[in-house]
């Protein structure tokens, strides 16, 4: 079906599931990733593809806190609505990061406001960030501006997740 790759970048452990071409489901790889070393980690982030497919459900079903990421478009808002329905169905505490934000209309932000969803951060559209990402560079290591944005975001996420999971206890 595929395989798992593991590595370390500075003090961050990274695990990636690689699905073989032609396979219909990545769920077995997700299960292997989650079963392996992840329980030993203090903080773990599981990145999922957009949408509400089985791999997304498998990834969130045992999560303590879910971070939904949406772009400021009708498609982004539609995808956000689908994933929002999933986290509600699973009863998961959650917050939203709005990505690639510009001034003006933001259907994803409107969806959050209408549904009382906590917006953790609005990351602005930025050509420099796109350049760094497309060149495989880690933005927080290359730019003090992005280090500040994402360090602040991590602090908010940890605080929010600890608060929400304490309420659920």
Model-found features: residue ranges?
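Inter-motif core of Ras-like GTPase G domains
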Residues: 53-74, 80
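Short, glycine/acidic-enriched loop or turn micro-motifs at the edges of active sites
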Residues: 50, 74, 102
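Short, charged, surface-exposed secondary-structure boundary motifs
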Residues: 76-81, 130-133
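Switch II (G3) loop of P-loop NTPases
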Residues: 16-25, 32-56
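C-terminal lobe/tail of nucleotide-utilizing enzymes
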Residues: 86-169
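Cys/His-rich short segments
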Residues: 1-9
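Structural beta-sheet core signal
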Residues: 46, 68, 96-98
């Amino acid at each position: 079906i595929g395989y798992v790759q593991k590595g370390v970048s500075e003090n961050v452990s990274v695990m990636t599931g690689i699905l073989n071409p032609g396979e219909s489901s990545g769920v077995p790889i997700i299960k292997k990733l989650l079963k392996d070393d992840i329980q030993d980690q203090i903080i773990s982030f599981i990145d999922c593809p957009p949408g509400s497919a089985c791999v997304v459900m498998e990834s969130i079903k045992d999560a303590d806190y879910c971070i939904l990421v949406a772009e400021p478009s009708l498609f982004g808002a539609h995808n956000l609505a689908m994933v929002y329905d999933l986290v509600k169905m699973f009863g998961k505490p959650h917050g939203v990061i709005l990505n690639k934000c510009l001034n003006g209309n933001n259907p994803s932000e409107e969806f959050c406001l209408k549904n009382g969803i906590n917006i953790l951060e609005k990351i602005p559209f930025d050509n420099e960030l796109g350049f760094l990402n497309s060149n495989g560079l880690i933005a927080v290591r290359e730019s003090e501006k992005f280090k500040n944005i994402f360090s602040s975001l991590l602090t908010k996420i940890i605080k929010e997740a600890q608060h929400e999971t304490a309420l659920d206890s």
